[in-house]
């Protein structure tokens, strides 16, 4: 929310933007699951994992365009919504098959333990993700109240889109790591 409000202005509605993800998942998960039914869980997950960096790169494009793509809506908002749509589609490929994949990795009788540990990534990513996001936000998109003029803040936040490059890189590394893991196991 801070990125959107700082870059798109106080009139931005990050709460509304956050509703895009569940809406897209609700509308698309059954369709994607049906399409991927004959494919392996790892194939479906890999497709989703490679969509994640695409999502981040779309979000980075928000302040690249000179004029508004849609009249009356900030490009930051438009590209954020497009990025969230792609991220939600990635979730449609990953989530339905994620627990299936972990249960198939488990030795007989230890499925519950493996399924429990399958959520460890959520814990770790929330800690590291929020920490990294805070550091990057401070570096590339600082709070405007810390500056004497709007021009000084604009100069300090000129590269705010770099934040998304970091997350695209992390997503790409994770996607290749999953491919490598699938080949090894």
How should these model regions be labeled?
Residues 69-94:
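Hydrophobic core of transmembrane alpha-helices in multi-pass small-molecule transporters
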Residues 4, 92-107:
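Intracellular juxtamembrane helix-capping segments at the cytosolic ends
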Residues 61-63, 157-185:
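Multi-pass alpha-helical transporter architecture, strongest
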Residues 2-26, 47, 78-81, 158-165:
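Loop-to-transmembrane helix entry
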Residues 135-171:
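A membrane-interface helix-boundary motif in multi-pass transporters
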Residues 11-12, 77-78, 103-121, 160:
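Loop-to-transmembrane helix entry/capping segments in MFS-fold secondary transporters
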